[in-house]
Amino acid sequence: MGGALGPALLLTSLLGAWARLGAGQGEQAVTVAVVFGSSGPLQTQARTRLTSQNFLDLPLEIQPLTVGVNNTNPSSILTQICGLLGAARVHGIVFEDNVDTEAVAQLLDFVSSQTHVPILSISGGSAVVLTPKEPGSAFLQLGVSLEQQLQVLFKVLEEYDWSAFAVITSLHPGHALFLEGVRAVADASYLSWRLLDVLTLELGPGGPRARTQRLLRQVDAPVLVAYCSREEAEVLFAEAAQAGLVGPGHVWLVPNLALGSTDAPPAAFPVGLISVVTESWRLSLRQKVRDGVAILALGAHSYRRQYGTLPAPAGDCRSHPGPVSPAREAFYRHLLNVTWEGRDFSFSPGGYLVRPTMVVIALNRHRLWEMVGRWDHGVLYMKYPVWPRYSTSLQPVVDSRHLTVATLEERPFVIVESPDPGTGGCVPNTVPCRRQSNHTFSSGDLTPYTKLCCKGFCIDILKKLAKVVKFSYDLYLVTNGKHGKRVRGVWNGMIGEVYYKRADMAIGSLTINEERSEIIDFSVPFVETGISVMVSRSNGTVSPSAFLEPYSPAVWVMMFVMCLTVVAITVFMFEYFSPVSYNQNLTKGKKPGGPSFTIGKSVWLLWALVFNNSVPIENPRGTTSKIMVLVWAFFAVIFLASYTANLAAFMIQEQYIDTVSGLSDKKFQRPQDQYPPFRFGTVPNGSTERNIRSNYRDMHTHMVKFNQRSVEDALTSLKMGKLDAFIYDAAVLNYMAGKDEGCKLVTIGSGKVFATTGYGIAMQKDSHWKRAIDLALLQLLGDGETQKLETVWLSGICQNEKNEVMSSKLDIDNMAGVFYMLLVAMGLALLVFAWEHLVYWKLRHSVPNSSQLDFLLAFSRGIYSCFNGVQSLPSPARPPSPDLTADSAQANVLKMLQAARDMVNTADVSSSLDRATRTIENWGNNRRVPAPTASGPRSSTPGPPGQPSPSGWGPPGGGRTPLARRAPQPPARPATCGPPLPDVSRPSCRHASDARWPVRVGHQGPHVSASERRALPERSLLPAHCHYSSFPRAERSGRPYLPLFPEPPEPDDLPLLGPEQLARREAMLRAAWARGPRPRHASLPSSVAEAFTRSNPLPARCTGHACACPCPQSRPSCRHLAQAQSLRLPSYPEACVEGVPAGVATWQPRQHVCLHAHTRLPFCWGTVCRHPPPCTSHSPWLIGTWEPPAHRVRTLGLGTGYRDSGVLEEVSREACGTQGFPRSCTWRRVSSLESEV
């Protein structure tokens, strides 16, 4: 009863004070009720000193009302609060919510939802239980929510790379929400968090202690996160200490719910306990109350500036609850955005601060709470160490599961970066590391160490070892930046940190050597390394003789002095002695039209093949020479391709690289002998310098003045030319060369390593961690994890294989195979040359002339055709019309022939024109001049062109002698005209004079001796109409000089026919000629008679001349002209000499063109006579040559044309002139215009 009177009397006094204020003053004041959740000394002192004089700096007058609630009975609390709201016009309530007042906070939240009165909690004790708050409640909290606390706790775990942890909770309200928040944060993070275990224990009074002990002993996590109340936390830590989970080897993190008051932590709390509180955790109760009242006052002031009046006081609890009035809703919105004394008090719709400032605190060794981190605007700033693991002298506490690791920055093994400026943390794949600051540590200084982020090859190895061996670690950078060296008896660097037990382990680019192994223990090497040398590329210039650099001088001499000359002489000698080429007429080699393949042309041919030039050359004809030329062409392809492939490497701007063979190279051992002196150095206080100092003292003495402070400085010196070579660990140099911008730095020998060793992890002497670390490293090596890490960290875009492609000359050894090929080809050519002569001079005469060996003849002809080709007879079909638009002699002759064909309808002339046209077209396409048949006479008394002579028309021969018109003689005997065949010429049977000539008869027939031929006059020839040829032999082309109808070789232009097919062939050719077109004479133009008029017309039949003889075996078969004799078409030479008649406008006189065009007519056409003509009766040496040739006991049929390849010398025209020939020879074929082209 007495307990209930106290609050009633207090309420009565408050109401009396409110009544005495007066109406006028109360309209401008804001009434704020301050409710204390306990009645301790601090609360009592604050209540007595809390007056309106404490809030004079606020924009509105404040009337504070203090209420103490120390009764946990909900009904009494509701009665007290509702009485206050009903008696006084209260604008808001400030509530001091400790961790023991969760029930009062819940009741106030209910009252706010009914009366819409703003309630502001200032201590944060009710933050956990009011998640979420009641609908319509205006309860605001200066504390942080459980979700915000979890975010900071996970940031602490991330800061120290504590990815594996366990969660232990009690049955306190909110534990399910806590577990849900842990899983949500772990799943949303990019880090691979590992929740090892989750335990829910009954930690209240009378709970099962044995079960709690058993479950705690099963936990195997170095980091534990707990959720419970203050009283439950005392029980939990007491049980955990008995289970061995409390100590330096374990880390505990709890939210502020488990702390309660931070004034006096319980004795069961372990040293190093980490928690998260608000930034007001060190503020006094009076300061907290002042902040709460200021938020309400500033919200009311903002409301009055907008609406001109203060917001209405809160309603009564007895009134019927209804919707929130617009004025109360507007006042609540003004309270959500308030700034006071530079701090942002913006609240979320849930009633919590949007951007709270939190503090990470830890229990130190003096049993005091110490701030070790700060969370501000999403960034965590931590102090190292996070818990007091060090004494005042920074000596570490012995810990069986936590290691202090020292390292040294050196790319790519340890790379140090600054934290993310936006979040203040480290990005993924990095580990927080620290570097000790130079200033003295003080309690107010939060940064005795500089926070950094470390990554790299060694950092990844450390993270994998921590997971496998299961340990936690602190990572810090050594202050002197050295690996470790003994200076005046004191070790520095990472070796000194481990040796003096300031660190449990050291990892980095730490080389294992004998001196270090005496004082510390090393693990198995995880990276193979040694000593290597790095140099820089320097730009050079292209030498003027760079185009000669692909081959050595010996190769050039061998190529052009020896090979080219020897092969050229070889080809010429083979061609010279070849039985089918040069050897056929050595005495005529220098005459016009004869063989002209000389040694100069042989050299020119081989030179053109070497450089693949399109120049005019003359190819050899011998088979052996052609084989040699083909082999030389293959040699030239290889030679030129090798030269071209290597030329680019020498023609570009060469880059000079200092090449050294090793540490024993003369450039290192005698650097002063170089000009300028060779400059090289290393980073001191390392294993590289120790190795050089121990083995090469003179070298070490020279390099001391060129030593560099760090690897980066050395690389800069190399690029700037201050250093010629840098000696250091091979693994580091290979990485730097691969990552160098521009790929200017290279390691010699593609990363050649000297004094091979490895990198290891340094541990204290006789450390119990050594065996576990070694086994873990061997497992990583066996699984290929280290190879994967090397691929990620130790490889670069500039590979040494590409950087050190150095050009070298091709020596004799490189080109020996090509020269060997030439030697073998020359040997094989000699064998082919000997076999060719053996077959030509010996074996071919031993083959019997038998019809059973016809297949050998066919086989021989086939092989011969493959190498030399056989001129095939053109088809009897009409060839395509030639191009008559060209301004050339050939085009003019073709035009003339076509015009002649259109003017006449004589079948014989028409067919002759057809054959001439096709022959000219064939020779024009093949670009080949047919060989002549026989020599033609020259006129002894030449006259002017176009003038008639007594002898009639002369033959179209005689070189430069123009044709002379002679008087025709009456015909004596008609000659049989054979069927005209295309591309084949035949002579008419002639009579010879009765003159006798001395003859030398051989085994193949009568021949004229050389002396007798020389005795003949130059113009001593048979009559022109008795010869087969139209020009002298001296002007023929250089074809072989063979007798008439040579035997045994078969003529080139004769196709092989059996004896039974000769007559069939002749009939078939006659039929083909008969089917040719024959224009009628009616279509003849009237100007033809004037163009081709002669004084002595020819008889209307195809006849020979006076010496023509009728063959007994053949009847004369002559064809008559279809038109009058006055319109007779003249012969080809007559047409050329006659001139242009009047009335023919298109006729262009080109006398010199015609004369030169018919000087090399190689064929004659006529019936083959089996008896000599009458004119040969006086020349018995011609009888043997007049017989038709017999091929393999076969006599060729009639009407066959042959090439005149006899050995007749020039005979004067007067020899047969005595017989008196009535008329000149009729020329039926124009064979060649090659001289004109």
From Swiss-Prot:
Subunit record text: Heterotetramer. Forms heterotetrameric channels composed of two GluN1/zeta subunits (GRIN1), and two identical GluN2/epsilon subunits (GRIN2A, GRIN2B, GRIN2C or GRIN2D) or GluN3 subunits (GRIN3A or GRIN3B) (in vitro). In vivo, the subunit composition may depend on the expression levels of the different subunits. Interacts with PDZ domains of PATJ and DLG4. Interacts (via PDZ-binding motif) with SNX27 (via PDZ domain); the interaction is required for recycling to the plasma membrane when endocytosed and prevent degradation in lysosomes.
UniProt keyword list: Calcium, Cell membrane, Disulfide bond, Glycoprotein, Ion channel, Ion transport, Ligand-gated ion channel, Magnesium, Membrane, Phosphoprotein, Postsynaptic cell membrane, Receptor, Signal, Synapse, Transmembrane, Transmembrane helix, Transport
Transmembrane segments: 555-575, 623-644, 814-833
Matching Pfam families: ANF_receptor (PF01094), Lig_chan (PF00060), Lig_chan-Glu_bd (PF10613), NMDAR2_C (PF10565)
Protein name listed in UniProt: Glutamate receptor ionotropic, NMDA 2C
Intramembrane feature ranges: 602-611
Positions of the record's site feature: Functional determinant of NMDA receptors: 612
One annotated GO biological process: regulation of synaptic plasticity
Chain spans, region Disordered: 907-990
Residue ranges, Extracellular side: 20-554, 645-813
GO molecular function, one term: glutamate binding
Polar residues composition-biased segments: 907-925
Positions bearing carbohydrate: 70, 73, 337, 438, 539, 685
Binding site for L-glutamate: 509, 511, 516, 687-688, 729
Catalytic activity: Ca(2+)(in) = Ca(2+)(out); Na(+)(in) = Na(+)(out); K(+)(in) = K(+)(out)
Gene: Grin2c
Signal sequence region: 1-19
Main subcellular localisation: membrane
Motif PDZ-binding: chain residues: 1235-1237
Stretches in topological domain Cytoplasmic: 576-601, 612-622, 834-1237
